[in-house]
Structures are given as structure tokens and as C-alpha cells.
């Protein structure tokens, strides 16, 4: 993009390259050029600004230009838009730009582009990966920590898919890049959960995915963010691989620059090595799994007088090649072959044997083309760094059988080697260390052909690996471990080797970055000039080393040497070689080497440094070709003379000599062409010059040590089928080796598992059989016990049935005997049991046609008082003779059976006392007389109830009634002061005490005669009008007093009572034996359900009398009634309903007296009128309140003028309405006195308008409550809803007033009935809890079986399971202590588990924050239960019934902490016996604090405070 006015506003540094004017970018070329940074108008609401976006706008017409110009953009001469930043100040002065606002484009929001297969921009760095983090960090905690930095879209913590353990890795994705960077900066400097983690900005989660694959053996991240999950997996894999390669390139470039800076300090130092030579020296070199690897040749000798060199740097892989004196010369691989006429055969390798196919299926086709080896220098620190990572150890054992063949023409050499390989590999994979040992047997066949090849082109020496090796996926690339040491100069080095050419670091970088389409290791060489030729030889070890191709790790670049003049690279820098300057001096440049003999060591070129060191001198590009220099005392290398090389004219033609002087190292720039592959003869001729046609001397080599790889120097391509496991660090181990190691380890593991499986299986099987047999035996034993118990229960049941039958027979016999005995009981005893309450029901408002005994008026209660008092204090009546019954009575009185029973009791007691002093004959006569008197009295009692009874019988009864009444009256006066409550309680007496006197007949007669009128009224067909108790009694008493009763007819004293047709036969038995007698004698008694005594378990009234009452049983059919006779019936009581019913009132059943039937006329059916139930409650009719008296009207005397003026003058606030009326009157009077408005001070007529004060809002009598039950609306005005009527205007304006304990207790919610010590539960609640217990019957059965099988029931594990499946019956209700409480619905024994305290387990720090928050909200912290020092259970919002347990200073429960499966739980145990309905409490054990909390438990030992 063309710009102008560069001096006016200099561009920013970030756009300096784009803003530079270029002469080539002119004319129409700019118009057609698609510039990345063009300016485009962007419209927003209220703003218009420019930004860089898309292609430049091409103004093709004037209208377009005018449209753009209106927005303030100028046009250049090339018809392009101008950068508005160049002349922004001038634009501000222009009228066009005054209405527009410009903003810098860097402040614009970056668009979130979708990542897909077409994504090619900078990756969005919104993902942050975390490594080495605390394993306690969860996704929730990580998200909480990340929220402090910005919006979190996704947070994930890596969990191992197999072990389900925390992998200490996670990632967080933010909404923006800035937020991700803030998070990275924050936790790069501080800890995350007390652990220093390693955050990384990780686009596409590339680094995290790679580490996850290493840890999980190739599995990818299971959970990704939404945008990454929507990408195709192959596309995402490529994006991750590109990002990782870019990161590796940046790291390599930084390390190379650091290395160059360090190496430049020692550059330029050149020292002469003519006076020095080396001793015998073994180089410990690294070997790696590379197809370019060849072993180095032995080092040249050094003069003895020279000081010994320092020891080489320790390398981890020296143990396998230590006995061989081989030193790698790093410059031999850079020697270029020269043109020569020397005929050297070039050997072509054969195909590898089939045993090699398991390592690499592509190796056999690529060895001939990929046999070039590169070498690179290493610093001592480099070797030290890699020595600790991994190592590979290998030993080769060569057998005695060696074969060599040659054909007739002498052009083919066949060499066979049989060897045994033993390698030991140690390397690190992730955080794991692997160590494996391999033993292999290999066979190599070498064939060669005598021919010469000229180096004509670059393509002949090496070919691309596209044809031989396929593309490798990024997963295989990512398995290569990145370096961890920052002092490595090249992290992608693979092995040492010799090559005829050199490769630059740029080539290595490009190979590492995978910019080529095939993503494989291509080798392209460039022909070198004739002045820079090198030679290449192979030692015996080089011939025995195969060429392994590792497609995982790219080969390292060769050491940087002297670049050629005609080469141009993107980075004009040289990688220096470092060497100590004190030991290696340069030899003379043109010194001729001495002849080589068998006794002398080979040549050595001292112009080259020894292996393992780098030179500190600058490269000499124009140095002449040096003459080979011979060094003495060098041990003979293990070289074998090959007949095919006999064309060499001189002895040194077949033995490698020293290299020439330092030659420039060639660097490859384009790698577009590949040189031809030179032959061995050409390389020899390029090194030593033209060969002569002399036969070389046969060299016989003797070694003091066994040769392991003594082979010919014909060609390195003849070793294609040899396999050598080379050693390197953990990052240069090939994928093949890793696969082999993993397979070998898996195989070994499977073998160990197979060996250990059999005994383990046997042990497990034996243990299972023993356990199974034990269980089966236990089950059989339990089954036998159950069968035995069942049989025993059946026998016991049969025995119980037999005993019951025996007891039944005995009872029948006893009842039969009792029935035969004469009975001397009265029917009144039966009547006392049938009171009104025995027929009553709580759910009914009526009684079964039976009205209760009226509670007599005080003035008519004397006889009742006497009757009740005579029970507690028996009086021995003086009238106990037989003639006392005929004494006359002055008047009739109303008496009851209970009053007559008292007299009978006294009479019977006196008779018993007189019996004790008499003879047996007298006693027998008295018994007969008493029996006849009893029969006579009973007959009189029943005959008096009948209307048809004779007058004689009535007179007899009347006389006896008078006698008993007089005696009752005399005794009543003596006991009139007795307690009324005891009289009520002693009203009911037994039949024995009430059956020996004749007063009962009198009471029955009087009661019966008083009820004749109601009976007559009922026969008229109209229902009797119910009366009150007082009216009924007063009416009856008046009738009795006013009427004159005829004397009754005397009653016979002999004969059975059951013979009378008007009597209902009966017998007196004990109430407990009534059911038995009814079963035994069904024909002579009524059934049990017809009398239903009140003392059974279903009744709610206890027996006040300690003596067991007896009841009277009527006979159903005492005699056959004659046809036409009236049946015997029991009539209801003759009294009407009463208001107050006594607790114990006897019900007397009497014969039904029917009037003679009269013919009645048929009447029209009337509407049925239901009587009102006298026992129902009726609301009283509403009464109108009387009208209030009229208010007294206040009158005030009129004020004087002075008082009015004073009021007006003293008015500071708004005057009230009365004062305003006075002001109005004063204004009107003033204005009326003037003729015109001009005479007024204010020059116009005014109208007074009153100002009303705002009245106080009306308060509601009953404030409206909110949904939570709190008062919300206090005023009638709806606008004042929520306003509290406080005089100060705000509740915060009121001072704090501490409430007393009494005030606090008045505010605590209490149950409705605090007097009840225990809670009362409904039947519905108990039924629901009982059904829940029945539903868990199967679980309890399983629990018992488990306890029985294990035998140990004291373990906490079983206790907690018992708690789970056998919960106690508990319920929460209002507590008298505070709020809600937990109550027991069943009796609980001591030390039994009641309930578990369930809640949310939180840490102590979180508990403190929640406690503060709860206190601010008024909830309180009473639901926080501390387990230990670090954990607290919070049941405030999540819990069960246990959180309702209140505190008590004298609790009946205690809390215990149990550990179940590593998790601590709190269980509530019972301390004492807890009865049904008692509240469950335990001691909160709050720590002692200054701010006291009052305790409301109310226990005897209450401390007063919880804390």
C-alpha cells in the first residue's frame, strides 16, 4: 500500500514493513494487488471510523470517490485510499472531519473466527493448560479460581480413564485472549491450592493433549470445549501438530542464537599443532537410531612428547563400544570427492533378511537411497545433558564362520557375517523408565561390483524418502520427547555419521517443521566445487553398522563449518566448532606423509581436531590442499585388505589417510536438487589424488583384542542389511525401538502374569470353596435350628391349647356349681353398671334412649348425702330386728337404689356380727329368716312396680319403705358434712351391700309412681316435652307430696321369685366371669355384648371402688308365657334430660307398664318434627349493643383581638385550619375597606386559599401479612406497604435495647400445650411410621443374615447399616425448648443409634464464611456440626430430621463420629432410656465465648448459657 507524507507522522513500529514505500509497487499494479491491510469505512450508531479490513476500495467512478470523501478519506494519485493516520492532525482541522470520530483499529474487537479445516490465521490463545497442579483441585474449584480473571467458558480436570485418578493436569478456556493471559500471569507467579503449578498458553490444547497421550498410551482428551469438539479430528490433529512444530522452531532458534553468542567469544584462535600428537585414545560417542549412522574410525596417533588430552565428556552409551579404539572425526563427512581415474568398486547391498521386517517394513527399499550420514559436533555439556536421559547398550559377538567369495572376473565380492546381538536399552517415556534387553541373531550378505562412478549430479548421491517411506502421522511425531535442557544446541540430532555434503540448520529446521508435503526426511545435496573436496572412509565398525531409518525423529544438522563463497542462506551465520586451544596445533600445510608400513600407524591429519571437540578458529576458505601428514605411533586400525581394491597403486591408497586442510563446509539452501552418488574410487581419488597402477602391499593386521566388525572399506552402501541398535538420549530413540520395548515389556508382563496366575487362581479357588462351604454349613445349621424351633413352637402351642381346654372345663364345672347355689343379690347392682356414659360415644350427640340420673337440687340432696356418706362410714342401725320393716313412716320421700343400699349394708353387717356370737342352729335359722326376708323384699320391690299389684302388697311395701326411710333420714343427718367429691365417687356400691334391706323396694315404688304421668302422656301419641333438671325434680317432688298413695298389699315371703310372671328372672355373677357363664349357659343368660361392662380395656373410666363389682344377668325366657300375656320389658328411666350429669349414675331397668289399649281415631299424618337434642350446643342469639350516649359538645369562649394577634405573630409553621380561617377573614376585611386595588400594598385583589396539612396515615388494626407470615402492610394506604410505623421514621434510628431473658422466652415459639411433658402424636403418624418399618423388612432380614454370617456385630460398619435399614420411629414437632424439636415415637433403649446427622461436608474456611453469612441473614449457625479440625457438616439447607434436635444441659443423647470407608459421619446415640413422646436432645458443646447465648432447655442442671 502506497503512502505519502512519511515525515509528517512516522508509522508505528509494528507496521514499518508495510508502510515503507516501494518503487516496484506503483502504477496499476497497486490497483490489482490484494493488500492485506487496506482501509475500509465502518459505520456504527453515532460513530464513523476507519479500520483495516479486506481489500483496498477501488474507486472506479466519481460518485464512489465523493461517497468516500464525505467520510473524510483522501484519495491518492494511484486511485487508492489514503491512510488517515498519516495526516490526522490536518484532518482534524478540516471541516469534513469535525463531525467524524476516528479510533485506532487496534482498539476494535477482534472477531471470533470459527476454527475449521480452512482456518489458517493465528490460533486463538484462549486456552490455558495447567501442569503439576494439586490433585485436590476439582473442576468447581478451578472454575472459581478462574472466575477472578474473566468469563470461563470451559474448565476440565484430567482424570485417568483406567485408574480414575487425578492426573494433575487441567485446562481452562476463557472468552477472550486477555483474560487467558491474565490467568496465566497470575498463576505463573503464585500458587494454586498451596501448590506451584505450571500454566501454559495452549491453543487447541496441543501441549495438554500430547502429555495426555503420553500418560494414557495414545488416548486423546475425552472432553473438549464446544468449538474444538465441533472440529473434525483430523483437522484438529493437523492444527495441533503445526502449533507444536512452530513452538519447536522458536525454541531451536533461540538455542542456536544462544550457542552462537557463546561460541563467538572463542572464535579466531588458531594454534599450531605441528609439535604435538595424540596418544591412543578411545572416544565415547553417542549412537542413535538413524539410518545415516556409521561408526567412526580409530583416532590418529599423537606424538608422545605432547601432553595428554583431557578425558572426553561422559556419555551414557559408551559401555557397548569401549573396547574398540574408535574416534569419530567430525570433518571427514564433509570431504568432497575429487575427480580421479582410480578404479574403485562400489558395493551394492542385498536385500535384508526376513527377520528385519518386524522393525521397519520400508527399510529394505530405502537404505540405498538414504545411506548418507550426518555428523554434528557436541559440546561437553551437551553430552552430559543427554547422558542422564537414556542409554542403549549393545554387544556384538561374531562367530568363527566367515565366508568370502569372488567370481572369475573379480567384480563381485560376497562376504557373510553371522553375529549375535545383545542390546540393553534404557530410556524415559514420560515419567516412566524402561529397561529392556534384546538378544538377536542376524545374518548379513554383502555384494559389490568393481566399477567407477563419477559424481555428475546431486540427485545420484541421495534420493528423497517419498518413494521408500510413507508420510507419518502427527501422533508418531508427537511421541518424540522434547528437550528439557536449555543448553542443547540442537534438539533434533539423531546420530553421528559421515557424509560428503553438509546441511544447514535451516534445512534441519525445515525438516522439523514439516513444511514439505510428504513430511518425511528428504535429503538433497548440492555439488561442491573442485577446491573443496573431501574423502569418506569407513572403519571396521562402520562396515558393521546397519543403516536404520527413524521416521520419528528428524536427523540432526551437521556441525557448522566453513560455508562456500557462492552459497547464500537466509541466515548468514556460522555455527562455530569449539576445541581447546592448548593441545591441537595445526601441522605444516604441505608436509608429505611418510610411507605406510605394517609396523607404523596410519596417517593422521593434525589440521583437523580430534573427535568430541570443536575448533575455535575461523574457517579458511582459500587454503591450498595440504599434503597428507604422517603421524607416528598410531595403532593399526582394524582394516582388512579386500582383493577388489587391488587397483590402488600405492599402499596408502587402500588405507585412509588424514584429511586435507580445513575446507569449507557446504550448506544446502534450496534443497531442490540432489547430487549424484559418487563411488568409493572417486572419493579416494578426490582425497589422495590420481591413483597409480601399483599393487598394494598386503597388510596383515593383528589385534590384541577380538575384532567384532572387521570388514572391508569398499563402500558404506554394502552394509544396508546390518542392524545395529545405536545409543542416544531419550529424545533420539526411534519409534521402532519404543514399539519393540513396549512389546517386549508387555510380553514379559504377560509371562509373569501367566506364571503367577495359576497359584493365585488355585488359592482364590480354595479360599472361595472354604468360604462357600462355611457359608453353606452355617446356613444348614441355621435352617436346622429354625426347623427345631418351629417344631418346639408347635408342641408348645398344642400344649397351650390342651391347658386352655382343661381350664375351660374347670371353669364350666365351677360355673355350674355356682349356678346351683341360691343367689341373694339384687338387680340394683346390675343397674349401677349401666349408666349414661357406658352407652355414650364421643362422636355421637345422643344416648340410647337412656337419660342419666339427675343431679338433685341442693335442697333435695339430703338423702343422697346420707347414702354416700353411709358407704364410707357404715353405721350399725339399731333397728336391725325383723320387726323394723313394719314401722310406719310419716311421709314419702324420694330415694334411689344407692341410698337404700347403704341401709342394707348396715343391716347386713349387724346381722353378721350377731351371727358370730350365736350357735350354729341359731345361725341357720337366721339365714333362713333373712333369706325369706330378702325374697319378700325382692317380691315387694317388683310387685310395687306393677300397676296390677294388689293393695295388700302395696301396703307391705309401703310400710317397709317407711321404715327404711326413717332410718335413712336419721343416718343422713349424721353424715351431712361429708365431702361432695367422695360422695360422688362412692355412689356405686356392690350388690352385696345393697341387697339386704327393704329400702330398695320403697325407692323403686316411689320412682315408679312418680313416672306414671309421663308414661300416660306417651300413650297419647304426642312426644313429651323435655324439661330441665330443676323443673323435672320440683314437679316430681310436688306430685309425691300432694298425692296420697294407697297402702300396698302385703307380700308373701315364700316361694320362688321367678314364678311370678311380672318379674324378670336374673342372677348375680362377677363381671369377669360373665363371658364364661354366657358361653357355658347360653340358654339362661344374655350375651356379653348386651351388657358390655365399663371396666374393659376399650373404656376410658376407671374403677374407683377397689372391690370388683358384680353384675346381674337376666334370663331370656324364665318361663313360658301364656298366650295373650304381656312380655316382660325393661323400661327406661322415668326422669327427663338434665344439664349436668354425674360421673357415676345407676341406670335402673324396670318392667314396661302398658295402659289398656284404647281405640284411637286415625289422624292425618303430621310433618315429622325432630326434637332438639338437649345435649347439643346452641350459639346464643346475637344481641345488639346499646347505642353509645351522645358526645358532649365542647364550647370555647371567643378570643380577643390581642390573643388573635399573638397567635398570628407566634406562628412559625403552617397554621392550622382554624388560624387560616381567621387569616382569610382578616384579608377579606382589609380588601373590602379599600375602593380600588391600587390602594392595597400589593396593588391587586388577592384570594385566600387554605393549605391543608397532610394527615397522618391510618393504621390497620390487623396488618396484612406476607407469604412468609410476617406483617407487611401496616397502613391503609397502599403506597405505604412495607413501611414500619416507627415514631423515629426508621427502625435504624432507634437505639439497641437488649431484651431480658423473660422477653426472649416470650418470643420463642412454643407448642400449644406446654403442660404436657411429652408430645402427643396422631394415629395417622404412627401408622405411617409403622408401615415404613414393615416395608424395610427384607432389608432387615438381609442385615441379620450378614451379621450372623460374619459373627462380629460390634463393628461400626454394621451399626451404620443398622441405622440405614432400621431407623427409629421419630418425628419433629413444636418443642417447648425452642422452635422445632425431634421426638421419639417409640421407646428407645440406651446406646442405640437413633439418626445420622446428615448435611453438606465443607471445609473450616468455608464454614466460617457461611457462619457470617447466616448471621447476617438472621438464620444463625446452630446447624453447623464440626467433625474434626478441618471438616464441618452444614445442615442449614441440606439435611434431615437430625438438625431439629435441640440443646439440653441434661441431654438424653450423645453424638459420635464414625469413619465408614474413609468418610467421617456423625451419628446420634441414646444415652438413657427415652420414652415414647420424649424430646431427643444432646449437648451442643459450644466453646466458651464472651457473647453468651441463653439456654432455654429448662433442665434442673441447666448452665444458663449454651456457650
From Swiss-Prot:
Residues 128-199 form the RRM domain. Residues 331-342, 566-575, 941-951 have a biased composition (Polar residues). Keywords: Chromatin regulator, Developmental protein, Methyltransferase, Nucleus, RNA-binding, S-adenosyl-L-methionine, Transcription, Transcription regulation, Transferase. S-adenosyl-L-methionine binds at residue 1484. Expressed in all cells of embryo. In L1 larva, it is predominantly expressed in Z2 and Z3 primordial germ cells. In adults, it is predominantly expressed in the germline. A motif (RxxxRR motif) lies at residues 1340-1345. Residues 413-444, 668-680, 803-823, 973-982, 1015-1047 have a biased composition (Basic and acidic residues). Pfam families: RRM_1, SET. InterPro entries: COMPASS_Set1_N-SET, Nucleotide-bd_a/b_plait_sf, Post-SET_dom, RBD_domain_sf, RRM_dom, Set1-like, SET_dom, SET_dom_sf. Component of the Set1C/COMPASS complex (also known as the SET2 complex), which contains at least set-2, swd-2.1, cfp-1, rbbp-5, wdr-5.1, dpy-30 and ash-2. This is Histone-lysine N-methyltransferase set-2. It comes from Caenorhabditis elegans. The gene is set-2.
Amino acid at each position: 500500500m502506497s503512502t505519502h507524507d512519511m515525515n509528517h507522522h512516522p508509522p508505528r513500529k509494528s507496521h514499518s514493513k508495510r508502510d515503507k514505500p516501494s518503487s516496484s509497487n506503483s502504477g496499476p499494479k497497486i490497483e490489482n494487488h490484494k493488500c492485506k491491510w487496506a482501509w475500509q469505512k465502518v459505520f456504527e450508531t453515532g460513530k464513523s471510523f476507519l479500520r483495516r479490513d479486506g481489500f483496498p476500495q477501488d474507486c472506479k467512478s466519481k460518485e464512489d470517490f465523493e461517497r468516500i470523501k464525505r467520510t473524510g478519506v483522501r484519495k491518492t494519485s494511484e486511485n487508492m485510499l489514503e491512510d488517515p493516520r498519516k495526516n490526522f492532525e490536518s484532518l482534524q482541522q478540516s471541516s469534513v472531519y469535525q463531525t467524524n470520530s476516528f479510533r485506532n483499529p487496534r482498539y476494535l474487537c477482534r472477531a471470533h473466527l470459527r476454527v475449521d479445516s480452512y482456518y489458517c490465521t493465528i490460533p486463538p490463545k484462549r486456552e490455558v493448560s495447567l501442569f503439576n497442579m494439586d490433585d485436590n483441585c476439582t473442576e468447581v474449584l478451578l472454575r472459581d479460581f478462574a472466575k477472578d480473571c474473566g468469563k470461563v467458558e470451559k474448565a476440565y480436570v484430567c482424570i485417568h480413564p483406567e485408574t480414575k485418578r487425578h492426573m494433575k493436569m487441567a485446562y481452562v478456556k476463557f472468552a477472550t485472549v486477555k483474560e487467558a493471559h491474565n490467568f496465566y500471569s497470575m498463576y505463573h507467579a503464585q500458587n494454586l491450592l498451596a501448590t506451584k503449578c505450571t500454566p501454559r498458553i495452549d491453543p487447541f490444547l496441543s501441549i495438554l493433549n500430547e502429555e495426555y497421550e503420553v500418560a494414557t498410551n495414545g488416548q486423546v482428551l475425552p472432553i473438549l470445549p464446544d468449538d474444538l469438539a465441533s472440529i473434525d479430528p483430523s483437522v484438529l490433529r493437523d492444527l495441533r501438530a503445526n502449533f507444536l512444530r512452530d513452538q519447536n522452531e522458536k525454541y531451536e532458534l533461540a538455542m542456536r542464537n544462544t550457542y552462537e553468542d557463546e561460541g563467538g567469544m572463542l572464535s579466531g584462535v588458531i594454534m599450531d599443532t605441528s609439535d604435538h600428537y595424540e596418544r591412543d585414545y578411545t572416544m565415547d560417542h553417542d549412537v542413535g537410531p538413524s539410518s545415516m549412522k556409521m561408526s567412526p574410525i580409530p583416532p590418529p596417533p599423537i606424538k608422545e612428547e605432547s601432553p595428554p588430552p583431557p578425558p572426553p565428556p561422559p556419555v551414557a552409551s559408551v559401555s557397548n563400544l569401549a573396547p574398540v579404539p574408535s574416534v569419530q572425526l567430525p570433518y571427514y563427512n564433509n570431504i568432497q570427492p575429487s575427480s580421479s581415474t582410480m578404479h574403485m568398486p562400489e558395493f551394492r547391498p542385498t536385500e535384508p533378511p526376513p527377520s528385519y521386517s518386524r522393525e521397519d517394513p520400508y527399510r529394505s527399499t530405502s537404505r540405498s537411497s538414504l545411506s548418507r550420514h550426518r555428523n554434528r559436533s557436541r559440546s561437553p555439556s551437551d553430552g552430559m545433558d543427554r547422558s542422564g536421559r537414556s542409554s542403549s547398550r549393545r554387544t556384538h559377538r561374531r562367530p568363527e564362520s566367515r565366508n568370502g567369495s569372488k567370481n572369475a572376473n573379480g567384480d563381485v565380492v560376497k562376504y557373510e557375517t553371522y553375529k549375535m546381538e545383545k542390546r540393553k536399552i534404557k530410556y524415559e517415556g514420560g515419567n516412566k523408565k524402561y529397561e529392556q534387553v534384546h538378544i538377536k541373531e542376524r545374518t548379513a550378505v554383502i555384494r559389490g561390483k568393481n566399477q567407477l562412478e563419477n559424481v555428475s549430479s546431486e540427485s545420484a548421491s541421495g534420493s528423497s524418502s517419498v518413494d521408500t517411506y510413507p508420510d507419518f502421522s502427527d501422533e508418531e511425531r508427537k511421541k518424540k520427547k522434547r528437550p528439557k535442557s536449555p543448553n542443547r544446541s540442537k534438539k533434533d540430532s539423531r546420530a553421528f555419521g559421515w557424509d560428503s555434503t553438509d546441511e544447514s540448520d535451516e534445512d534441519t529446521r525445515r525438516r522439523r517443521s514439516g513444511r514439505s508435503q510428504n513430511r518425511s526426511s528428504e535429503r538433497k545435496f548440492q555439488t561442491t566445487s573442485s577446491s573443496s573436496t573431501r574423502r569418506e572412509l569407513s572403519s571396521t565398525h562402520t562396515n558393521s553398522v546397519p543403516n536404520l531409518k527413524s521416521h520419528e525423529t528428524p536427523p540432526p544438522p551437521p556441525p557448522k563449518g566453513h560455508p562456500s563463497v557462492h552459497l547464500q542462506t537466509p541466515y548468514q551465520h556460522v555455527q562455530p566448532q569449539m576445541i581447546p586451544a592448548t593441545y591441537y596445533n595445526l601441522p605444516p600445510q604441505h608436509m608429505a606423509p611418510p610411507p605406510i608400513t605394517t609396523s607404523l600407524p596410519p596417517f593422521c591429519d593434525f589440521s583437523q581436531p580430534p573427535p568430541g571437540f570443536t575448533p575455535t578458529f575461523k574457517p579458511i576458505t582459500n587454503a591450498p590442499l595440504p599434503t597428507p601428514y604422517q603421524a607416528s605411533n598410531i595403532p593399526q586400525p582394524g582394516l582388512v585388505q579386500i582383493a577388489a581394491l587391488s587397483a590402488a597403486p600405492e599402499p596408502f591408497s587402500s588405507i585412509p589417510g588424514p584429511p586435507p586442510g580445513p575446507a569449507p563446509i557446504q550448506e544446502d539452501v534450496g534443497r531442490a536438487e540432489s547430487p549424484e552418488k559418487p563411488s568409493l574410487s572417486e572419493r579416494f581419488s578426490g582425497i589422495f589424488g590420481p591413483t597409480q597402477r601399483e599393487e598394494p602391499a598386503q597388510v596383515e593386521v593383528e589385534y590384541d583384542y577380538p575384532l567384532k566388525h572387521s570388514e572391508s572399506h569398499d563402500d558404506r552402501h554394502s552394509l544396508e542389511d546390518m542392524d545395529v541398535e545405536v545409543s542416544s538420549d531419550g529424545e533420539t530413540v526411534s519409534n521402532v525401538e519404543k514399539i519393540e520395548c513396549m512389546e517386549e515389556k508387555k510380553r514379559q508382563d504377560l509371562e509373569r502374569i501367566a506364571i503367577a496366575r495359576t497359584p493365585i487362581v488355585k488359592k482364590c479357588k480354595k479360599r472361595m470353596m472354604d468360604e462357600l462351604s462355611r457359608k453353606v454349613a452355617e446356613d444348614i445349621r441355621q435352617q436346622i435350628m429354625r426347623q427345631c424351633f418351629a417344631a418346639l413352637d408347635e408342641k408348645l402351642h398344642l400344649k397351650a391349647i390342651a391347658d386352655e381346654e382343661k381350664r375351660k372345663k374347670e371353669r364350666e364345672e365351677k360355673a355350674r356349681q355356682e349356678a346351683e347355689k341360691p343367689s341373694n343379690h339384687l338387680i340394683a347392682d346390675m343397674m349401677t353398671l349401666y349408666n349414661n356414659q357406658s352407652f355414650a360415644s364421643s362422636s355421637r350427640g345422643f344416648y340410647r334412649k337412656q337419660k342419666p340420673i339427675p343431679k338433685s337440687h341442693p335442697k333435695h340432696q339430703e338423702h343422697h348425702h346420707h347414702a354416700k356418706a353411709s358407704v364410707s362410714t357404715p353405721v350399725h342401725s339399731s333397728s336391725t330386728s325383723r320387726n323394723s320393716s313394719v314401722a310406719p313412716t310419716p311421709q314419702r320421700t324420694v330415694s334411689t337404689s344407692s341410698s337404700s343400699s347403704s341401709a342394707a349394708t348396715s343391716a347386713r353387717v349387724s346381722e353378721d356380727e350377731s351371727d358370730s356370737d350365736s350357735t350354729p342352729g341359731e345361725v341357720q335359722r337366721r339365714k333362713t329368716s333373712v333369706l325369706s326376708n330378702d325374697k319378700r323384699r325382692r317380691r315387694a320391690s317388683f310387685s310395687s312396680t306393677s300397676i296390677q299389684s294388689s293393695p295388700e302388697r302395696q301396703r307391705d311395701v309401703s310400710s317397709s319403705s317407711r321404715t327404711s326411710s326413717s332410718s335413712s333420714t336419721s343416718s343422713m343427718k349424721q353424715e351431712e358434712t361429708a365431702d361432695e367429691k367422695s360422695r360422688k365417687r362412692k355412689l356405686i356400691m356392690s350388690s352385696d351391700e345393697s341387697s339386704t334391706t327393704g329400702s330398695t323396694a320403697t325407692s323403686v315404688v316411689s320412682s315408679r309412681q312418680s313416672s306414671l304421668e309421663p308414661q300416660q302422656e306417651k300413650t297419647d301419641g304426642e312426644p313429651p316435652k323435655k324439661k330441665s333438671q330443676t323443673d323435672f325434680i320440683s314437679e316430681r317432688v310436688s306430685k309425691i307430696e300432694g298425692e296420697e298413695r294407697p297402702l300396698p298389699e302385703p307380700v308373701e315371703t315364700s316361694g320362688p321369685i321367678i314364678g311370678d310372671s311380672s318379674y324378670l328372672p336374673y342372677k348375680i355373677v362377677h363381671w369377669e366371669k360373665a363371658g364364661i357363664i354366657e358361653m357355658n349357659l347360653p340358654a339362661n343368660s344374655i350375651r356379653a355384648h348386651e351388657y358390655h361392662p365399663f371396666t374393659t380395656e376399650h373404656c376410658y373410666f376407671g374403677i374407683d371402688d377397689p372391690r370388683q363389682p358384680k353384675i346381674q344377668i337376666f334370663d331370656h325366657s324364665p318361663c313360658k308365657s301364656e298366650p295373650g300375656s304381656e312380655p316382660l320389658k325393661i323400661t327406661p328411666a322415668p326422669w327427663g334430660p338434665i344439664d349436668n350429669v354425674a360421673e357415676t349414675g345407676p341406670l335402673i331397668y324396670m318392667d314396661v307398664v302398658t295402659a289398656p289399649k284404647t281405640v284411637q281415631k286415625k289422624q292425618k299424618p303430621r310433618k315429622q318434627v325432630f326434637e332438639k337434642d338437649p345435649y347439643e350446643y346452641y350459639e346464643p342469639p346475637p344481641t345488639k349493643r346499646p347505642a353509645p350516649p351522645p358526645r358532649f359538645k365542647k364550647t370555647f369562649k371567643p378570643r380577643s383581638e390581642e390573643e388573635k394577634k399573638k397567635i398570628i405573630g407566634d406562628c412559625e409553621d403552617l397554621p392550622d385550619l382554624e388560624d387560616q380561617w381567621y387569616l382569610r377573614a382578616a384579608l377579606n376585611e382589609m380588601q373590602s375597606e379599600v375602593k380600588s386595588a391600587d390602594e392595597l400594598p400589593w396593588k391587586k385583589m388577592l384570594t385566600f386559599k387554605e393549605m391543608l396539612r397532610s394527615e397522618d396515615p391510618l393504621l390497620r388494626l390487623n396488618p396484612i401479612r406476607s407469604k412468609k407470615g410476617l406483617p407487611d402492610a401496616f397502613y391503609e394506604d397502599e403506597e405505604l406497604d412495607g413501611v414500619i410505623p416507627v415514631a423515629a421514621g426508621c427502625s435504624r434510628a432507634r437505639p439497641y435495647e437488649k431484651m431480658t431473658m423473660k422477653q426472649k422466652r416470650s418470643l420463642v415459639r412454643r407448642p400449644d400445650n406446654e403442660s404436657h411433658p411429652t408430645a402427643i402424636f396422631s394415629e395417622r403418624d404412627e401408622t405411617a411410621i409403622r408401615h415404613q418399618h414393615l416395608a424395610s423388612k427384607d432389608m432387615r432380614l438381609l442385615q441379620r443374615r450378614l451379621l450372623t454370617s460374619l459373627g462380629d456385630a460390634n463393628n461400626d460398619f454394621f451399626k451404620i447399616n443398622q441405622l440405614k435399614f432400621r431407623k427409629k420411629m421419630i418425628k419433629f414437632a413444636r418443642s417447648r425448648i425452642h422452635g422445632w424439636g425431634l421426638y421419639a415415637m417409640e421407646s428407645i433403649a440406651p446406646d442405640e443409634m437413633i439418626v445420622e446427622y446428615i448435611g453438606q461436608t465443607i471445609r473450616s474456611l468455608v464454614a466460617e464464611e457461611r457462619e457470617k453469612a447466616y448471621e447476617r441473614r438472621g438464620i444463625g449457625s446452630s446447624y453447623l456440626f464440626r467433625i474434626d479440625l478441618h471438616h464441618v457438616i452444614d445442615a442449614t439447607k441440606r439435611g434431615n430430621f437430625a438438625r431439629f434436635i435441640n440443646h439440653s444441659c441434661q441431654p438424653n443423647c450423645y453424638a459420635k463420629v464414625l469413619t465408614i470407608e474413609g468418610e467421617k459421619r456423625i451419628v446420634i446415640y441414646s444415652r438413657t432410656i427415652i420414652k415414647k413422646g420424649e424430646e431427643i436432645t444432646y449437648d451442643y458443646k459450644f466453646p466458651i465465648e464472651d457473647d453468651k447465648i441463653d439456654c432455654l432447655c429448662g433442665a434442673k442442671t441447666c448452665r444458663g448459657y449454651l456457650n
